[in-house]
Amino acid sequence: MQIALLSEDPNRQSELEAIATRWGLEHDEDNVFALVLTDKQLELRKRDEPKLGAIFVDLVSGAVAHRRKFGGGKGQSIAKAVGLNKGATPIVLDGTAGLGRDAFVLASLGCKVQMVERHPVVAALLDDGLARAKQDAEIGVWVAERMSLLHASSHDALEQLMAQDDFVQPDVVYLDPMYPHPVNKKKSALVKKEMRVFQSLVGADNDADALLAPALSMATKRVVVKRPDYAEWLDNQKPSMAIETKKNRFDVYVNAAMA
């Protein structure tokens, strides 16, 4: 994939080249999107809209840290959806990892989470944020133990993983496909910015419906699909149950009891 690759720290140019090689990125000077390596982090910028600022993965501070400390623990909806309130600590595969926020919440509650991200730029951002989180004195140890990243299309990845001899099937497959955002729906400034940049970079998740069948084959216990409250069921399949929040709902497809 082509994108502008820029290093603001001359000492990190070789790191940027390694990132490009790892994720299959080619430098395009005129690209509207730039992947920028600063002295602190890897970030994505939309060069024709500088007011949008930079997008990067921060699992250590800010909103993510606040949610980890004050978000309601195992009583929050996502925890109930994956079955944490049943006394189990499931192994989770997050098939649409994005910036890793939901995966991080589940890992902070004790789950081992394998993240799959199909877009190379998003995967590169997530990998950088994960590496920085692993260095943090407060959370680094358990982040390293519980969170891992695989870059591949979720559809292909699920089948590829199932074919591996040493692969341990997850208890839960978690999906949060990108969904078109109605103009009249209110979102926070941060989420609006990210959605705007991501949807122009990644495009719509038009093949999201195709995720459900392989997810149901892979999960030993359940599949959880996060949807906006106004969205239809994924692949038009009715879930076993739904857990509703103010703006979203978690559609739960049960294969077996959590016990």
UniProtKB/Swiss-Prot annotation:
Location of the protein in the cell: Cytoplasm
Main localization (coarse): cytoplasm
The organism's place on the tree of life at top rank: Bacteria
A molecular-function term among this protein's GO annotations: rRNA (guanine-N2-)-methyltransferase activity
Keywords assigned: Cytoplasm, Methyltransferase, rRNA processing, S-adenosyl-L-methionine, Transferase
Family annotation (InterPro entries): 16SrRNA_methylTrfase_J (IPR007536), SAM-dependent_MTases_sf (IPR029063)
Reactions catalysed, as given in the entry: guanosine(1516) in 16S rRNA + S-adenosyl-L-methionine = N(2)-methylguanosine(1516) in 16S rRNA + S-adenosyl-L-homocysteine + H(+)
EC number: 2.1.1.242
Gene Ontology CC: one annotated term: cytoplasm
A Pfam family hit: SAM_MT
Positions of S-adenosyl-L-methionine binding: 101-102, 117-118, 153-154, 176
HAMAP family for the chain: 16SrRNA_methyltr_J
Function: Specifically methylates the guanosine in position 1516 of 16S rRNA.
Similarity section: Belongs to the methyltransferase superfamily. RsmJ family.
Protein name: Ribosomal RNA small subunit methyltransferase J
Lineage of origin: Bacteria, Pseudomonadati, Pseudomonadota, Gammaproteobacteria, Vibrionales
